[in-house]
Amino acid sequence: MYLQSLQKLCLIALLLPGLSWAGQVYVSNEKDDTVSVIDLDSLEVVDTWLVGDRPRGIILSKDQKYLYICASESDTIQILDRATGQIVGELPSGEDPEQFILHPNGDWLYAANEDDALLTVIDIPGRKVITQIDVGLEPEGVGISPDGNTLIVTSETSNMAHWIDTRTNENIHNSLVDARPRDAKFTADGKQLWVSAEIGGTVSVFDANSREEIKKIHFSPKGVHADKVQPVGIRLTENGKYAFVALGPSNHVAIVDQQTLEVLDYLLVGRRVWQITMTPDEKMLFTTNGVSGDVSVIDVDRLKVIKSIKVGRFPWGVAIADE
Amino acid sequence: MLACSMSLLLSFFVNANSQINELKVGVLVQSPEIPSAVPDYLKPNEGEGLAGALQAAKDSNRTGKFLGLGINLNMAQLDDQQALISQAKEWMADGVQILLVDADTQALLALRKALPEELILINTGNREDSLRTETCLANTLHTAASFSMQTDALAQWLRSRRLSEVMLVKGDSESDKKYAEAVKASLKKFGHKLVAEKSWSFDTDLRRVAGKELQAFTQGPEYDLVWVADTRNLFGQLLPYNTFLPRPVVGTHGLEAGEWSQVIEAWGAVQMQNRFFKDNQRPMTARDYNAWIAIRALSEAMTKTRSTQGAELLAAMLHPGFYIAGYKGRKLSFRPWSGQLRQPVPLFNQQALVATAPFEGFLHPRNEMDTLGADRRESRCTLASQE
């Protein structure tokens, strides 16, 4: 009797995936104007939600109730209720928002406006723009230090990482990196900043205090022409062990030792891999593969690709909720 | 203490920004001679090339302001060779060190001869191969792709599609002849067969009778495709769908090969296309792109050297480690022997990007992009000594 009702419950949960509170992976599909919902247990697409035009950056709210989605061509950031899959509001984003990041306080959002060479600072509870900061051409990747005091925005055509003090919203430093910087990430201890350069083919690691470059990491997966090695998304494990770097059209993800800054291995994933996100327990890594239209799942303990999941056209961003 | 060091840093950057070290660049465009028989919709846009340079200066100065570097443009479009020379001299007297030139071969040679060698030229429009192989110009770079880069790109595509028997149809202008020579060399280089060669020199109004006339004209032996050499748009646009055998048309019309087209959207290009359209109310053309990439290369060299000295910038651009990002998905660089910009060559029609050369399988010991156009051993030029 008990078993039966449990089965029924499971059935209901399967039929109403939007209501299930198991862990879920959300993938924005740039050319389909949708978000694919993947169940973290079954690793299958359980739902597809229609969102604004050209969805790219996608992140979770601090309480994990909402998804914020950069609908680039709708010139807005949409707020989506995870429980219902419905758009419940919008945030003013400036024109053509591409990537963004949440301040650790959960209230401030920093969005790069690619077409306007601006960084927009948004107050989420008030749903208003706090300020816009002048940055280099085609701002793209945004990263924030764990203490929330330092924000980094990379500009793709100016080849710079701009350092911004979030307490004053002033640009305090500019570091030149290789061509077309795409992503910026601080290590969990806040001591290092990693910046990927897509056309340069490198990742620059900076000392976050002195703002000096410590090392430039180069990549050479076997059998791939150097020009096709185009680093984009970076993920650093919180335990300080690994860094994962998506290498674009080389169709590989590099595994880097966070301590020695040496490349350990390369994993073959889908075609043109751009963004990567890890589950909060750091056991699984999801990559978006734009050209093959799928997501590769990597088992972090075994460092193996365990599955690829078909999603929409041109998957771009990925966010993961563990409950 | 913290606040103090912060304000020091801030003032440092304010200082750096307020003193902009400027590089003066001239942009010279020779007004193209357009026969009246060319339909209006195929005539070049007003200010083509100049608009690209302007866009790049805007783009570059946004980066430059963080470094205290800037590019200052002087621009002119003139008809006459003599007027081009005197304009260049006037600018030089005013401190211009770099000159972008889009002109025919005669005018380009005359300019190089009339101006001192320390003035660096960047050719943004002339495709003639001899300027990269025989007539080597001092301190001159080329961002315009040569005819042979265009024809090699198409010849590689023919290989990838297993098409090899070619009927060549050429116009009678000087540049049509130069283009046709490049076609023949590419056919040989990539093992294709020229089965027929025809010259179009008629001056009838084709508009109502294109089907009849061109079908009759393209009769001959069996062919896989028609390759058209009509650099002036006098008849080539009427060839696709009007060939005697229903075969593809490639070359100056049909499937084209060039540096740029509005159909290119990948590799982040859509951002620049949008930026350009917003400012100019028209799409960016290849001549705009060639000027754009020339200024971007200068800007990149300025960032690398923190210098605004022409000679230092030229050396930096020819340095083996130098590269620029040009929305083409690969690093672009200059061939040290001829000063030619190495670049992927997109193949496109009016509505879509079809493919991008170099194609997989065409290998090169140094750089696959050097399978397009004159390689080192095919050129007598030695612009830079180091590789």
Where is each model-derived feature located?
Chain B
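Bacterial N-terminal signal peptides
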Residues: 2-11
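Extracytosolic ligand-binding ectodomains
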Residues: 16-387
